[in-house]
């Protein structure tokens, strides 16, 4: 009776007679044969899906969406992604770069799983310090013995926190240089200094291939000038395998 009721319900749902009933049993109607083909095909597809999901239990896959600060993407991210893709080749990466304040905004909009920002930003969920690097004064070797006041200061636009830090150091050292040359990119700034065009204040992330002279800076009270890099994420999304593995890997490779 239970099976008979199920068959009747199926016919009612489909609006068609699927079986011819007789004392000898039931026979499929043309509609019933079509329904059987669909049911069998669906059952095969369901079994295939079960097998694929079982295989994926031990495989990290899916899509990982990251937005990264421009400077981090240039000087650190390639090494991190090379290691990550070697470990997780089945993950599809969606990487975008932006200014740190915009990276945070994108994360707040839930458009990405993770954001890597430079500088101090308020964020109430997952936040990991990846690196705290010194901020340095740089000049070319040909200008090593030239007093700073006689050299052109090369200015660079940055976030308010970093600009305030540089302004404080300049004030404490009674220096008020006019930025006769102002650029908007860190690598451009370093290239200008390398070419002997003047001196500048930059975070050390960009100095791996700088062949001039650099010296870490300190405030008058002895506190070093530093620049921090953070990994930000939503805690609920850190449970996704591809996100969890990226967090693990970038932390293992961080310089903090």
Language-model-derived ranges and their functions:
Residues 99-100, 108, 118, 174-218, ...:
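Hydrophobic hinge/microswitch elements
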Residues 13-14, 35-57:
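Alpha-helical linker/hinge and terminal dimerization helices associated
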Residues 61-122, 183:
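Central regulatory/effector-binding core of bacterial HTH transcription factors
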Residues 11-28:
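A short LG(V/I)-centered, amphipathic sequence patch enriched
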Residues 24, 69-74, 119-121, 135, ...:
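Short coil/turn segments
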């Amino acid at each position: 009776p239970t099976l008979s009721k199920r068959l009747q319900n199926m016919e009612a749902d489909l609006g068609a007679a699927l079986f011819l009933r007789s004392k000898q049993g039931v026979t499929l109607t043309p509609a019933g044969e079509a329904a059987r083909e669909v049911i069998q095909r669906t059952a095969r597809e369901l079994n295939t899906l079960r097998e694929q999901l079982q295989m994926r239990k031990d495989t990290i896959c899916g899509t990982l969406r990251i937005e990264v600060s421009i400077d981090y993407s240039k000087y650190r991210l390639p090494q991190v992604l090379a290691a990550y893709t070697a470990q997780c080749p089945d993950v599809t990466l969606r990487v975008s770069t932006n200014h740190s304040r915009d990276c945070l905004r994108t994360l707040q909009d839930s458009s990405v799983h993770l954001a890597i920002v430079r500088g101090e930003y308020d964020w109430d969920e997952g936040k990991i310090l990846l690196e705290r690097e010194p901020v340095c004064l740089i000049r070319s070797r040909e200008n090593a013995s030239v007093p700073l006041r006689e050299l052109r200061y090369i200015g660079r636009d940055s976030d308010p926190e970093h600009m305030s830090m540089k302004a404080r150091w300049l004030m404490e050292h009674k220096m008020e240089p006019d930025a006769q040359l102002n650029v908007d990119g860190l690598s451009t700034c370093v290239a200008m200094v390398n070419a002997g065009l003047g001196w500048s204040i930059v975070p050390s992330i960009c100095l791996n291939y700088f062949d001039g002279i650099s010296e870490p800076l300190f405030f008058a009270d002895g506190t070093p000038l530093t620049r921090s890099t953070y990994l930000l994420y939503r805690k609920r999304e850190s449970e996704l395998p591809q996100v969890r593995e990226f967090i693990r890997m970038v932390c293992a490779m961080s310089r903090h």
